[in-house]
Amino acid sequence: MTIAPAETSTTKQRILDAAERLFAEHGFDGVSLRQITAAAGVELALANYHFGPKTDLYIATIQRRADELNDARRRLFAALPPNPDVEGLIDAFARPFLDKSLHGGPGWKSYARLIAQTANAARWTRAVMTAQFDPVAELFIDGMRRALPAADPRDLYWGFHFLIGALTMIFAETGRIDTLSHGLCRDHDLAAIYARLVPFMAAGYRALANVKTGRDA
């Protein structure tokens, strides 16, 4: 099969766009490769040609935006002072996702839901989450070591675990907070959420760092 480079790029993007939307809506097991290629308007053989089996397409779908997200985070980390504060680190990690969700178009909305699913599925931990996101996660945790030098190292990892849980829930925009608050809070109001997220998580990190007794390993 001989395909021109420009056509190849366009075809791959169409497949990835369709996969991202359908995986986000139905999950990995709820959509077939045939359904994805039908939504993309391409032949099934082209998905196999460019990506291989559905598992590889799923990983490629995550990786496409992970690279962009991680690059933005690295730039913000690099701009921080040598001894950053807790708020600055949380902002550098979380803001790129906020900016993409607010201004990146519907694809980023689908991606947020997809990441929320992936982060909560053990089957993808090593192949996706570890491979795509751990290097930048370690940069964040290293920064926290400098910001909170007296903290128990375990708490730096637990704090990151809690932060990721909050981010995936927030940016997935499930509507849960809308229902729970009877409309007082809106999960699509990401700017309002973010204004509360950073001080909330920073206070949590500092509280963990200040706990000296009364906690088991």
Place the predicted regions along the sequence by residue:
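Short alpha-helical scaffolding segments that buttress acidic/His motifs in well-ordered protein cores
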Residues: F93, F97, A112-A119, L163, ...
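C-terminal peripheral helix-coil segments that are non-catalytic and often amphipathic
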Residues: T2, H103, D134-A217
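An amphipathic alpha-helix adjacent to DNA-recognition modules
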Residues: K12-D17, F51-R74, A78, T130
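Short, amphipathic alpha-helical "lid/cap" segments that border enzyme active or binding sites
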Residues: L16, N70, E87-A94, F160, ...
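Hydrophobic alpha-helical connector segments
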Residues: R74-Y111, F160
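Helix-turn-helix
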Residues: R14, L22-D56, A60-R64
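Amphipathic alpha-helical segments used for helix-helix packing
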Residues: E87-A92, H103-D134, T174-T179
